[in-house]
């Protein structure tokens, strides 16, 4: 499993890198500022970005340098979500301070700022690279048109109940959102300002903390405070597997590039890798001293294309 980046972080103020096949921790990076809320590997696989409260830090992956090579400062609350333009030209972040920010990875300072008027729980980038979709504590999903710099749509799946997590399929066929009541909402994007509710389901009886659609759009994974992860068939939203083994809340998950494996992070201080064909836990990663709340798995081929100017 060479070329695989597997990293975890959480409340013990460390980022740990793992050899995926053996379970050995190969490197520990200290993050003294705060807990780490989310981790993302850049498309070129050279860097990992860690977001906490309220800072965002960029670290080299293949290096022993313990210090961040760049910091992105501007948020005033927990940074809850982040991601990258597909070639790594820019990064987006969402925060409990009620804003979404866009950053040039190669420069200091925030490039754009969008006000949500509510704590932002989750943000995802539309595959067209021209829209961000956010979910907030007031129960709203918003679509942000990055060309026009406006909010092009706003809708509420379940009144004022907070939307915890949102994700869009790589082929833009489906948007999934979930809330603290364990309900998942499945939408068909008709246009930038029209998302049609296709299905809703009680995925868990407790919080859904993260919902993720796999790269080949075959599976939906839902992580829950009920200690399980459920794998759903995207074609008909039928349940395929319930992944059981974690002893406390499961906060985050990350699919492998070909959608065969899932990495999960839990308050039980461990991460796991699961085989999605069998639903079995293949390996457990031990070493954190407090809750693990984020995981990044990247076994894809690095995108080494140069970011376009402009």
What residue ranges belong to the model's regions?
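Conserved strand-to-loop turn within each blade of WD40 beta-propeller repeats
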Residues: 9-12, 51-54, 94-97, 135-138, ...
């Amino acid at each position: 499993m060479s070329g695989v980046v597997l990293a975890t972080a959480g409340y013990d103020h460390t980022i740990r890198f793992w050899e995926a096949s053996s379970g050995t921790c190969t490197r520990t990076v200290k993050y003294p500022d705060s807990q780490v809320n989310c981790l993302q590997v850049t498309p070129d696989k050279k860097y990992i970005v860690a977001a906490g409260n309220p800072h965002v830090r960029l670290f080299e992956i293949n290096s022993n340098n313990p210090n961040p090579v760049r910091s992105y400062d501007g948020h005033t609350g927990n940074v809850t979500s982040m991601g990258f333009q597909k070639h790594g030209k820019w990064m987006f972040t969402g925060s409990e301070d009620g804003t979404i920010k866009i950053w040039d990875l190669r420069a200091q300072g925030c490039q754009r700022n969008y006000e949500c008027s509510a704590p932002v729980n989750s943000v995802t980038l539309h595959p067209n690279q021209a829209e961000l979709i956010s979910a907030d504590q007031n129960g709203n999903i918003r679509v942000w048109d990055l060309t026009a710099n406006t909010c092009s749509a706003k809708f509420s799946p379940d009144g004022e109940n907070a939307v915890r997590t949102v994700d869009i399929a790589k082929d833009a066929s489906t948007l999934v959102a979930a809330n603290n009541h364990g309900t998942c909402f499945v939408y068909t994007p008709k246009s930038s300002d029209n998302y049609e509710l296709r299905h809703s389901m009680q995925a868990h009886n407790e919080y859904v903390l993260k919902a993720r659609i796999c790269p080949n759009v075959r599976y939906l994974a839902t992580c829950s405070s009920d200690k399980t992860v459920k794998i759903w068939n995207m074609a008909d939203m039928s349940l395929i597997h319930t992944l059981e083994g974690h002893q406390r809340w499961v906060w985050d998950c990350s699919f492998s590039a070909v959608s065969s494996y899932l990495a999960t992070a839990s308050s039980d201080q461990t991460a796991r890798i699961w085989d999605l064909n069998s639903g079995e836990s293949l390996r457990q990663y031990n070493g954190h001293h407090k809750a693990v709340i984020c995981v990044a798995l990247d076994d894809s081929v690095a995108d080494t294309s140069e970011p376009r100017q402009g």
